[in-house]
Each structure stands twice: as C-alpha cells, then as structure tokens.
C-alpha cells in the first residue's frame, strides 16, 4: 500500500477508498426536505394566514358578517397514498386532498350566530416525493427567485434608452405599487429629484413630500442642503398641500374626476392601506435592516453628543465611529436607551384620516425616527462645516405597510449617499433576492381565489332581501378555489412536467430555481449581469448547473446544502472557528447578508486531532473577494467540499480539473442518461451517489423498523410485531419521458431492516448507489477517421451483451365516442383489414398482453359510422326500401405508430359504465402500453460525466477493435483531440483511476474539490503495476500491427443519453399536406417532409439546374393541379404536364389582398398600357407544311412568296424558332 486512505462504506455494502483531506463533513440532508417543508407551511400557516387577510366578510350594509373560526381547518387526504396515486395515474385524475373549514355567520341586528363546517376546496396534494399528480401526469412546482420586497439604493445606473447615469432608490412591496426616487447625475446642470409611482409619469419629489404634509423648512431641516435638494426647492412652484395632491392625483388616477374625498384618500390608499400595499414580513425585515444607522455612520465623526434618556453623555462629539461602535449606537436606539426623535412640522390630517378608516392605534408610532448628526470625514470635522443628518427608521416597527418614519429614513439615506455615507445595493446579489417556494406560490393562488369568493359573497348578500334565509353554504361558493388551482397547475410557467428520465434528473427538477415566470424576468430582455454567477451564490446556488441557450443563468439549481429561511432567503451551513479551533458541535446557517465582513475558509483545510487549524496562513473568502489571512482571523469554515455545487455537478469526479463550460454540459447530460437494463455503479464515484439513491422518490425506504416477512416483484411486507406494513413496488411503469420505472427488491425474507433504510433498487440504482451508466474499457486513439469530430467507435460486444440496452414504454390511446351519426364500435371484425394486421387481437378486438407487435398492426379494432354526405345510388335504394339508411362502417382502428413496435405489456380500459370520469361524448377509453428493447445503435448519443459527448459512428466486430498486449479488446475508442481544447482533464484522471480500480479489484470515492491528487494516482500506478505514464501498447485489430505510440487506456463511466436515433430517424414517401400552403408538413410526428428552403433554392439557381428547380418548386411541392396530372400521367404513361402556378403564390396574393393590394397574373394580355394591341413576334400565321419540307431539304424558305408573310423582313426572322 502506497498511500494512507480510509475505507468508507456506501449503499448496500460497497466499500470505497477515500484519499481526501476534509476532516468532518456534514451529512447530506434530505434533498426534498425544502419542498416538503414549504408545502407543509402552506397547509398549517399559509391557508390560515390567507383566511385572516380576507375574513371576516362584511356585507355592504354591515348587517351580515361571515368569519372564520381559528383552528377549525381540517385537511382530509386519501388513506393509502400509493393506491390513490396509482389510480390517479391510470385514470388520468388529480391526486388531491379536501379542506374543510368552520365558518360563522353573524347577524349584527339580533346577534344571531350560525356555525357550519363546509368543504372549502379540493386541491392537488403533494406526494411524498415532492410532486403533484395532475390529470394523471406527474408535475413539479419550481421555486422562483425574485427581487426581495424592501428598499434598494443604486448609484450611477445607466438608463436603457439614453446614455445618462442616474442615482435611484426603489421601494418594492410584495403587493402594491412600486415607487422610485431618482435624479440624473450626468450633464452640466444639477438635476431635480423626481418621484415615480409604478410606470406613471414623473412627479417632483417635493410634491410628494408636500402632499404628505412637509414644508420647505422641514425638508431642509431633515435632509440638509445638497445642491440637488436646493435645486428641487428652487424649481418647485406649488405651495399648498391641495395643489400638490391634485398634481399627483392627475398623474396617478389620470381621467378620474377630482373630489375632496378622493384627494384625502389618495396617498393613504396607495401606501398605508394593508389590503392594497403589503411589504410582508420579508419587506419589513429588509427595511429595518437597511434603514438603520450602521452603514451610514460607520467611519465618520460624531457632530454632537449622544445623550441617554437620563441625560447621561454616552458618546462624545468628535468620536470616530468604527463599525463596532456604530452597532453599539444602533443597539442603544433599539432598546430606547437613546431616545428616538419625534417628527415635527408634518401635517397630520392624512394620518388622522387613515386612523379614522383603519382604526390602527399603532399609527402614531409612525412619527418617531433615530437621528444622528455626523461629519463624513476628518477634514469637515476640523473645519467644523455643517454636519450631515443621518435619519434611521424606528427600529421597533413591525407594520407590513410603509410608515412615515420609513419614508423620511429612505429620503434621508438617498441624500446621505450624495455625501458618500452609506452604500449602494447590488440588485443581483442574493442579499436582495428571495425564493418564492411552492408553499408561498400556492398561498398566493389561494388568496386570489378567496378574494373572488369575498366579492361573489358580497354580491350574493346584496341581492337578497331576507338575510335569514341565507346559509353559510349558500353564500360561499368554492368554485373559484378549484378553478384557480386548476389554472395554476395546468398553465403556469412554474408548474412543469417533471423530468423523470432517471433519479438524478427527477431530483434536479424538484430543486430547480427559475428567475422567469410571473413577477420575474423576461428571457428576451434579461441582461448579462443578471445571468452571471454572483459571489453570494457560494453554497446557495450552483455556479455550474444551468441550461445552455437562451435560459442560461436564468434557470438555476440549489446547492447541495442550501435551505430557505423564514423570510425566503437562501441560507447555507458553516462551522464556526474561534482562535483557530473549529467548533463541530453546532452548525451555523447564514444568509448572504450575514456574511458581511466575515472570513470563510474551505473545508479542505488541514485540521489536527484537537480541531485546530494547522496552516498559519489561509486563502479565505471575505466580502466578495479572496484574501490570504492568518489562521486566527478565520471566522467560519465550510461544512463540506460539495457545499458550492448542486447535486448533478457534485456527481462529476475531478470536477476541479474540468473547464466550467464542460462541467456545465456534464451536469446537464447526466440528467439525460437513460436507465439501462442492468445498472452498474461507477468505479470512480464522488460519494453523493448514495445520497441521491437514498432520497430519490423512485427508490423505496422502509416505513417502519422490523423483519421482512414477504418479498416478490410487486410488494415487500415488513412486520414490526404490531402491524405488518405493505410496501408496494413500482412494476413496469412508464415515466414522463417514456423510460422504464422498475423497482427491484434488495432485501430477502428474514432480513431485519431499520426505518428509512433502502429496501429496493429503482431505475439507474445499483446496491443503493446512483448508477447512470456503465464502466467500459476506453482507449484514446484515432482509428481510420471513424472518430473524427467527437464520433464514438464502439465494440459489437456492447450490443451483444446488452451493456447499453434500455427499455422504453410507449402509450397509445383510443377513444370510443357517441355522435349523432352513431356510435364507435369495439370489434375484431374490421372491414378491409388484413389477417396479418389482426393477428394479435382477442375476440373483443383488443390486443393480447404479451404480443409482439410491429408498425401497422392493429392494437384495438374500432369501426365508426361513415358520414352521411353524398350517398351512393345503392344506399339511396336501400334507404327507400327499408325506410332508413343502412349505416356503413369505416375502419378507424388504433394501429401501431411508425417505429413504435414492441411487446404489449399492459392494457388499461376506462369506461363510463364502470364509473370512470371521461370527457363529454366519450363512452370508453383504452390505453395500450408497448415496451421496446433498444440496443445501442449507430446515431445514438453517448457521453461521459465531464461534458465529453459524441455520437456512435460505427459498431465494430470485436475482432476489429484495438486490443491490449494480453489480447483484451477495448470497448470504446474516443478521439484524443477532444480533450486538449475542451480542457476537461477530469476524464483522463477518471480513465487512469478506473484502470487502477479494475486492477486492484476495488472502488474509489473522490469528492469534488477534495479529490485524489495526481501524485496519489501515480503512486497507485505502482501498486497496480501500471506504467507510470498510464499508457499501454495497443494493437490494431484489423492489421495486427502495434500502434506507433503507447495509448491511454482505462475504465471510464459512459452514459447512453435520451437522444436516440430511433426517435429521430425519419423518411417520407407520401404523407399529409398543409391545408393553407398545400406543402408537405414538417417533422417526424406529422410524417412530414424535408423542407427545401431558400438557401437550397439558391444552390440550385447557382448551378442553373432549371428543370430540377422547376419540379421541386411545383410538382413535388404545392402545385395541386400539376401534381395530380403528373401522378395520372406517370400511371398512364403520358407526357409530363407543364408546371403550373404553385399554391404558395396564391397564398401570397391573398396575403396582399388583406393589405388592399390586388395582385393578378395575366397570361398574354394583348394590350399595352396605351390600349394598343401587342403582337407576339412568335405568334405568326401557320406555315404550310410543303414550305417546311422545302426548307428541310435545302435549308431555305422564300417566305415572301406567301401572301401572309409579304410584310416580313426575312433578315429579322429566327427560322429556327419558327420551325421548332
């Protein structure tokens, strides 16, 4: 043994060698916990919270009130989750739960109360796997990353339209109007400060301040004398409160008539009304955090003594304020040791008015702020220049709306920035972004629905004269809730069809984060800055995994350890470090805002047995940069080397040796790996494979601890001595992507199991570890040009031994309808169908399970009534004799689609007679499931885990494959030119380590960023008796000659991807045409043709291939008459007709007609613009045949001997044209 390693156990008894440095790493959490916790929050907190916001519902006349009894909420979900989900999938239903609630109706006149429990809603319920079953399909609701409510200050922001720079502050609520204060900082003139509500026109900031009761003096007193403020005061002409309110009213309410009541209510209704303007707890938290004193008074000098309530001087004038001191001052304001100042000189009528409307006794708190006078620098202190007022909001506020203290603090901060106090915010930082999880998204839908219920209820009450007849049930209609959820799950961008190819893809789709969707960004306008990786993403969002293409950087994935806190911010775990000692006893979860001024070391730092950091100097992360600091200055250490990356990226061994672009492709392609017939765990793993298998919904964990008493392919029974627990296995199920879901038991009768232990292997799982591909012997060498441009050469052995064979399940459905013309009939007697196509049908006309069917075979026999149009003479006679029409039947059977042949594995019949819920007019629906066994073929896409992808170009006989000195043929030959420019060296390291693993009959684990070092691999070469270079002598299988140079050969983990040639290969001989253009349709699904486009036309034009071009653009395309004539003429052996007008020309003419332009084609119109007749020089009188015969003999005709040609000048006549 050459190097110290630990043997770590993974999955079910797999030992792997671990050579990493990391001392103690946090165990990976259950990856689906955040999703499940969020839904749980919705059930227990979100729904009651929504009720509190809408109820009580009070009638317009105030006589009737309907309130919600707290604690009465009851959620009723199906008893057996497995059976309910299975039924929902087969029958195309939604797996849902019922919500019951007790509502109280109160008559204000006589105080009479009536209580009633009602079924409020039935909405989709989350499965244990974090998904929803909607109409039989499994869907996931992805989390959304959006701007956090609160306040965001920005300096020198470039305007999109012009090249001007602006300072601005955005006040963002969760519900309500966005507000903005801004002014231009470029240009020669000092700009006035403006204010904007939503997308309305700009209003002078002074108008807004005046409208909430400020005078010029108060404005100067609080916000200083900056040039911008003085310019704003100088230019502002409206003096009275009413004039300013009127200006704002005209801009915001536009065409509404101005009334006294409207003016009074204007600002309170926009800002202070909780139902119209809501910051939520997150917004209030952000406001209080941003609008405190700390950021602005740090590194300044006090310009006055700070005195306590007891008149004791706490901080003297002239004191230099460090960040620590600033925190102390803020703390003293928080606990009111230093008194807050009352806001003076503000007209309180607006607030009195609001108090009158909302009865909000806390309103008067709004009049207090914390004020500190400071000098920005030493120079201004020595010169005793005018100090700057720093105003912070009341630190103890908890209102969900804006308050006057907030407005004053925001405006103060805005002007403080001009004096270089405070700091501007980064909108792309995770400090200013939050996650809206599934629970909150569902709560939003629930709130919208409750608002509709409130409106409908009030309307219903107002129409009834006798209120005593109304019951709670008759007033509250739950339809809006059902419709709202149905709409959300079926059409929202955030409700997505689950990626179910393999367990990794499934896990990644549940942990996806999108910046798109309602309230998010637009992919067409999103700038580079928004898409880029940000330093705050560390440990929260993966910097690697994101789609290629237009969604890059907008769709992201959570990192392995990230969680979401109560405010919706992503938090990540760390161990605390004090005086070089790491405290492993407690995990600290930090949000991005809490990382300011702290230093973080990586998990791979060497630590001794006493948990003391060994190196004296460390590279640490601090305030968005990397520094080398003393070990004593480290505050925190990462909990794991996988902390930075997502699950998919963490599954790439030697990720640190790959270029990020290729790592991105590698993590995306692993999610597309097809589950193979026999799964095989990788020789070189990263350690996350076991966690993925353990937490994946496609694998089954024991619900209880106990003894296994029964095992078969469909169920496992565990008995704990009290009650046996049945665990149902998924058996030959179709996934969303048509791959196979099959669970195989890994326990035997008599085994003892613990709760939470894996008891089966699902798809792409091997002994409790994720197994997406196969370990195959790979050589990096060129071979007769067959692996040019990333093509892959594979051995026939991989095909024969079913190494890369996968099973795919196609579903075909047929409906039996009842129409006026008659009913569809299920039958085995199908008119004009061949005996071969009916071979597999039973007596009823349904295919027998187990049949091997091929393209065109009938799966379900169905005949439908023919339409009544144009009856034949015979049909008329029959109708006359029998008094009714003899209904003719046409064959409308379900046949195997092109390329979808295979083995029939299941037949599912849904019928209205059996109580199944089918769409209107459908009496029966039959589903046929066909399984295909797909071996690897030329054209299939394969990939490694490092972004090294390619297409199979040739399958060679084993004897032709290059072989090693001992005669072992390689399985795959890859092109070595695919490595240097792509810079994914990880694949080479994996190749060598795989060879070592095979020789030593062991397996390795090499976690990302804590992997096996190259020096260790070299030492392992000695142990395994492998040449130091890792290269071997290779021989050509065809010539038997040795290759000129040694070749890198080893075991690499290769995947077969979902992009298979069977799904893509397509040819058309005859097929459907588009009705409008009369051109063949496009695409495989429609049996379409290959488009001969504009550029292909240019190519033929450039060669002058007129005949080819003519027939391509007419007969073979959209010349209807021409192609029909052509068909007839080919059959009858006639001449090819002349090409007519293509239909697309008529489409163009119709298009122009819609624009009032008449386009006509005139063939040989005999008049010119002046109305004179035009003679066609070729339209000459017919020449008698004897003249032509003479011409043919001696080559001349004396045309002027003929009367008709007397006027013609012989010299100008082209005789060849005349006689042709």
Curated annotation (Swiss-Prot):
Pfam families documented for this protein: RNA_pol_Rpb2_1, RNA_pol_Rpb2_2, RNA_pol_Rpb2_3, RNA_pol_Rpb2_45, RNA_pol_Rpb2_6, RNA_pol_Rpb2_7
Keywords: DNA-directed RNA polymerase, Nucleotidyltransferase, Transcription, Transferase
EC class of the enzyme, as a word: transferase
A GO term from the CC aspect: DNA-directed RNA polymerase complex
This protein's record includes keyword Nucleotidyltransferase: yes
MF term (GO), any: DNA binding
Documented EC number(s): 2.7.7.6
Catalysed reaction equations from the record: RNA(n) + a ribonucleoside 5'-triphosphate = RNA(n+1) + diphosphate
InterPro entries: DNA-dir_RNA_pol_bsu_ext_1_sf, DNA-dir_RNA_pol_bsu_external_1, DNA-dir_RNA_pol_su2, DNA-dir_RNAP_su2_dom, DNA-dir_RNAP_su2_hyb_sf, RNA_pol_bsu_bac, RNA_pol_bsu_CS, RNA_pol_bsu_protrusion
Biological process, per Gene Ontology: DNA-templated transcription
Signal peptide: none
Function: DNA-dependent RNA polymerase catalyzes the transcription of DNA into RNA using the four ribonucleoside triphosphates as substrates.
Family recorded in the similarity comment: Belongs to the RNA polymerase beta chain family.
Subunit structure: The RNAP catalytic core consists of 2 alpha, 1 beta, 1 beta' and 1 omega subunit. When a sigma factor is associated with the core the holoenzyme is formed, which can initiate transcription.
Protein name per its UniProtKB record: DNA-directed RNA polymerase subunit beta
Organism: Mesomycoplasma hyopneumoniae (strain 232) (Mycoplasma hyopneumoniae)
Gene from which this protein is expressed: rpoB
